[in-house]
């Protein structure tokens, strides 16, 4: 049977399943952060505020998140071993991710925005490696794959939410057009 708990397993499985599903929320953080930039870079106010960046600079702004994610994913195992899985996730969101979001939201120049993208990527990389690790180590084996797969689903939900928020703010004639989508990431971090 599908998702049938083994009869010889002792204890309640539902607390671990709920915690694992909640941890999947980190995927929204990842997907939303990845998805916001595609809409933001086309917003008229953002283009004017950031001195009409050329294609090379746009490529840097978009891809620097992946550089941070790469570095974060490499460091995630070490951090998780030092701080523990749960605290590793919490610290990854509180420190590098929130710093990156703050820098992006406050930025009025390309270098600060690029630095913010890197630090947000660092936090996303740390989280994206630690959450599946945490889920895999805490969930019962009979449900583990489905719950870890929910993390991937949450990435897609995050991309969808980013598209909605970008669409809703794109025609604002002020910095709120790009700052609102960026600042909403604080809410995702707070929830996680």
Positions of predicted regions on the chain:
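Transmembrane-helix signature of 12-pass secondary carriers
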Residues: 1-192
